[in-house]
């Protein structure tokens, strides 16, 4: 991979400075899906400075399990980017590449929508993030051609906050013990 000649010196500086780079898994990038993410980590010898910005919106339209990605790359999730995607029913005309149709056009096979209005399994995702011990930043990347941005951004923040609950202090079945 040509990009490795450029990437290794950058990662050397990041290693020296204690910086962790969160690469967004996105078409057109070196790691754009599950297997290209595996191959990229292998190609850079799993250097700790290189991890992922978990953005499930791009995984959804590529048919990648976003929760499985969290579990499989648990030590490489360096940033969480909450953006949602709504998949439209397959109709034999709309593909995953968008067909150069405008955002929000019902002929598209999918669209970005305000967080909580699409098909990303948010609760399962946040439970998986909790299970892997993720304590890093969480951002909301808001894109929705069919909703006012101020309304949508505020609503998205509230939705994500509703998923950030505290863990129980004891297992639920402890209430049934005889002690």
Kindly give the residue locations of the regions a language model identified:
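Active-site acidic/histidine proton-transfer and metal-coordination neighborhood
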Residues: 1-52, 174, 178
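A structural motif corresponding to the C-terminal end of an alpha-helix
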Residues: 9-21, 124-135, 163, 167
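Hydrophobic faces of well-ordered beta-strands that scaffold small-molecule active sites
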Residues: 21-23, 50-56, 78-82, 136-140
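Active-site-proximal loop/turn and secondary-structure-junction residues that shape catalytic pockets
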Residues: 27-29, 56-58, 84-86, 144
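Gly/Pro-rich active-site loop or hairpin
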Residues: 34-38, 42, 60-134, 147-151
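A short, acidic, flexible beta-alpha connecting loop/helix-capping segment that sits on the rim
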Residues: 139-149
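Short, flexible loop/turn segments with low-complexity composition
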Residues: 141, 169-179
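C-terminal helical cap(s) of enzyme catalytic domains, especially alpha/beta-barrels
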Residues: 149-170
